């Protein structure tokens, strides 16, 4: 029986060999974000479909991802599709994240704000996260104007969120509950 860990470990080992761990790590997050934007898992359904030949699936992967992801990551996607296990891709990537973070004793995080942070602000946030996670932090910043104000910090295992969009969402849930 094939499991997601085997795919995740293979991706980790290859990315280490090619010295592309950070790049593949970032692209894996980008891919998961993209895949989750497809309605009702339609990307997974398409790449697992029996109506498409393997050759058609490989062409589709190239067309969708070749210009946006490194060859190593695209080849990973092709392999998992060729083996017929695209439904395991999310689990495989989560295992890959765990391998990277455990092996490198580092946590990769995304700091998402509604506006650009100053260097001192970033320094304070990173120091606080290193203390909270008891790990060295490597970060990537993103701007998401839909947050309105506040911050969202994502790691592979945790989410820290303090922003108006989240607060409004919780408030709406309370109203629906009444």
UniProtKB/Swiss-Prot annotation:
Function: F(1)F(0) ATP synthase produces ATP from ADP in the presence of a proton or sodium gradient. F-type ATPases consist of two structural domains, F(1) containing the extramembraneous catalytic core and F(0) containing the membrane proton channel, linked together by a central stalk and a peripheral stalk. During catalysis, ATP synthesis in the catalytic domain of F(1) is coupled via a rotary mechanism of the central stalk subunits to proton translocation. This protein is part of the stalk that links CF(0) to CF(1). It either transmits conformational changes from CF(0) to CF(1) or is implicated in proton conduction.
Subcellular location: Cell membrane
Record keywords: ATP synthesis, Cell membrane, CF(1), Hydrogen ion transport, Ion transport, Membrane, Transport
Main localisation: membrane
Family: Belongs to the ATPase delta chain family.
Entry GO terms, CC: plasma membrane; proton-transporting ATP synthase complex
GO molecular function: proton-transporting ATP synthase activity, rotational mechanism
Self-association state and partner proteins as the record states: F-type ATPases have 2 components, F(1) - the catalytic core - and F(0) - the membrane proton channel. F(1) has five subunits: alpha(3), beta(3), gamma(1), delta(1), epsilon(1). F(0) has three main subunits: a(1), b(2) and c(10-14). The alpha and beta chains form an alternating ring which encloses part of the gamma chain. F(1) is attached to F(0) by a central stalk formed by the gamma and epsilon chains, while a peripheral stalk is formed by the delta and b chains.
Protein name from the UniProt record: ATP synthase subunit delta
Membrane protein topology class: Peripheral membrane protein
Coiled coil: none
InterPro entries from the UniProt entry: ATP_synth_OSCP/delta_N_sf (IPR026015), ATPase_OSCP/d_CS (IPR020781), ATPase_OSCP/dsu (IPR000711)
